[in-house]
Every structure is written in C-alpha cells, then in structure tokens.
Amino acid sequence: MALLSGIFSSDMAIDLGTANTLVYVKGRGIIMNEPSVVAYHVKDGKKQVLAVGEDAKLMLGRTPGSIEAIRPMREGVIADFDTAEEMIKHFIRKVHKRTTFTKPKIIVCVPHGATPVEKRAIRQSVLSAGARRAGLIAEPIAAAIGAGMPITDPTGSMVVDIGGGTTEVAVLSLGDIVYARSIRVGGDRMDDAIVNYLRRQQNILIGDSTAERVKTSIGSARMPDDGRGASMLIRGRDLINGVPKETEVNQAQVAEALAEPVQAICEAVMTALETTPPDLAADIVDRGVMLTGGGALLGDLDLALREQTGLSISVADESLNCVALGTGKALEYERQLRHAIDYES
C-alpha cells in the first residue's frame, strides 16, 4: 500500500522560509520558488484570499485599506497559523496534480531552535493543507545535505545557514547535530538595518523592497577598499518635508548599516567553535565552514568571517536552494536518512 501511495502521489519536500517557500517534488527536483506572502481582500471583517506568492509580494506596502498582505512566517516559524495554512494549501494544490490518487507525504524543514509548540503548528498546518503524513527535518541537517557535505562521516562539519529570519550555526558528525544555535538574524534583519540607517543618516524612509534591492545590489559585509565602493540611486520619502526624494547610497554606507547583523553572525560562529569538542573543532579547522542560504550571498561575507575566525570559508554552489535540495534528498533517500526525519505527532 505504501508503495502504491508513493507511485500515485506527488510526495514533496518544502522549505517553508520566512522570505520564500520552495517546493521539491520527489523525482522532479525543485519546481516552485515563491515569496511566503498571502494577500487578502477584507470586507465586513471577512477575509478572502486574493493572491499568494509572487503576486501577493508585489502588493506588500502598496495595498489600499481593503487589501491586506501578510507574511505568515517570522524568524523561521509560523507567526500566523491561518495564513500559513492558506499559503501551504495553495502551494500544495499548485504542485499536486489532480491526476494523482492519494494525498502527498510532505517533509518540511524547521529551525533547530523551534519549540515543540512551533513544530506542532508547522506539522498541523501541513496536515490541514492536505498532506497524508508530515515529517520534519532540522534546517542545519537539510542545508548540509543540500550543500553536499559528508555529514554521515565520523568527522566534524560546520554549516552556517543564513535565511530570511534566522541564522543557524551547526556542527554535524555521524549524521546528527553535535552543536547548534539559532539566532534571530537573517536577511530581514539586514533589510531593517538598511532602512534604519538611511532614516537616521539621510532622513529618507524607504520600503522593505527597496532595502532588499540595495542589499542584493551593493550589500557588503566589509568596507570597500576605496572607502566608497559602488553606488546606486534609490527613491523614498523625505522625512523632513514629506515629499518623494531620490538619493544616492554607496557600498561603504551599506557596509556600515550591516555591521551589527554581520557581527552577530560572526560571533555565533565563534561561539560554536569555542563550544565544539576539540577533536571535531580540529576537523573544522582542516575542512573549513560552509555557508548556505540567501544571506550567504551578501558581498564579502565569506571574507569577513575568514578575517574573524581564521578559518577557510566556502559559499555553497546553490546556497539559495540548499535547504530545499537537502530536504528533497531526505525525501528521495528516506531509508538512508530516516534518522534525520521526525514523523512524531
């Protein structure tokens, strides 16, 4: 029966991220990557789903009073249960074709630091959205698998997964987590830091989407060698007279804005090294540290970490997709990786 269920359903793995949700279908790979956003039309106190994913993200910060755009995930876990369920249900229906006969089995990655209540909320959302069975896998393990790290070897490996809401620092050996710490610093905190910096330094208020564009275009974890670096024009609202304003921001300013979240990530890595058993720490010195997640793409972050730790730092080839790929591999090779998947209710 289990074999027939696998044949006639689209079993899937989901990276339920704060910023984006990625869906991996067994035997097909990653087939969907959309923003974790739901837009509602609100009338007489009743909500009706208007858009989910990319279309809903376009509405963030631009909605009239009757439309509400919500990000149901915050810092890697569900902040709005009902909205998360609507979003997951939409993505499952989009991927799970009506030609299949049974509900899909779904594995979802969760932050290592998620509480039992938060894990239960994710599992219940997935089951309510139409899964026949819901498994959970720790995000650091999924990230390491997706990055191709030899986590089942009897040696230490360190992975630093920088997502939208959290950064997970973990030391792995023999297929399990030896040490892990989750800090509430990620891409969203970096965007907030840019918004706050420009508000203080240039009296301009920009939206989250503009801050994200600045981060991805000229964001840097280190001061540029020439003291200025690349620059770009941005538009926002002048906080002095309230009118629209265009101004230039350069790489040095962005590096200054990001100094605090970057330092928090560096300190989390240093704490992990100090806490790791000596033999495993020696392995990490030999093999270096792997960066995954969208935050790993921040300019010169690997160099900043190398300067602070003295270790070799590598960025995974598909850092944005590592967690989804790793969760997908856990689905594909479930028998070999069953120790990493939690199906407990």
Give residue ranges: language-model regions.
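Nucleotide/phosphate-binding catalytic cleft detector across ATP-hydrolyzing
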Residues: 1-162, 170-290, 296-345
